[in-house]
């Protein structure tokens, strides 16, 4: 083993026990190994957030890559008064919303025709053939249908549901990420959950009707 490999392993061993915030301080002080470790810790979570919000895996991967480009480029913008994950998800949420607007521009749908993307009542339906990539085709039917239903929830409420129920962020952290009042966060999450339940009910009613017809031989 070369000296550089030995040094690299020693550096990794030193960094592994550190918190996210401690790793950011190391990164700000010149440790690229700290950045690599942060990326390993959160790459999948960032892509998962973007996928759940956008409904398209390829776009989610692109967002994930850009998130860590921003983390690298703007590392000195991170202040140690907040959690690293709050800063990270703020970047992820903003880039995901930007990508959603790009999606509609690519599909020749103006924001004026589509309605206000920040409206609680406006749900943007991504085509169903985009909701699951080929490499994830082995996911359960339930997981697929939950994602379809999630994409029918209005973007503002969907963002909060993903942060709370899928990314396990606290209400206080979500308020920081979205710059919303705590009471607004809680009410929108409740509203979004109700929307999700309604869409799941609609999907499963159709699903069971199909199988009833098949069982009847029709």
Q: How would you name each of these model-derived features?
A:
Residues 39-57, 74, 150, 202:
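Amphipathic, Lys/Arg- and hydrophobic-enriched alpha-helical face
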Residues 48, 62-69, 82-94:
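Structural recognition of an alpha-helix C-terminal capping motif at a helix-to-coil junction
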Residues 76-80, 90-111, 191:
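Arg/Lys-rich amphipathic alpha helix in sigma70-family domain 2
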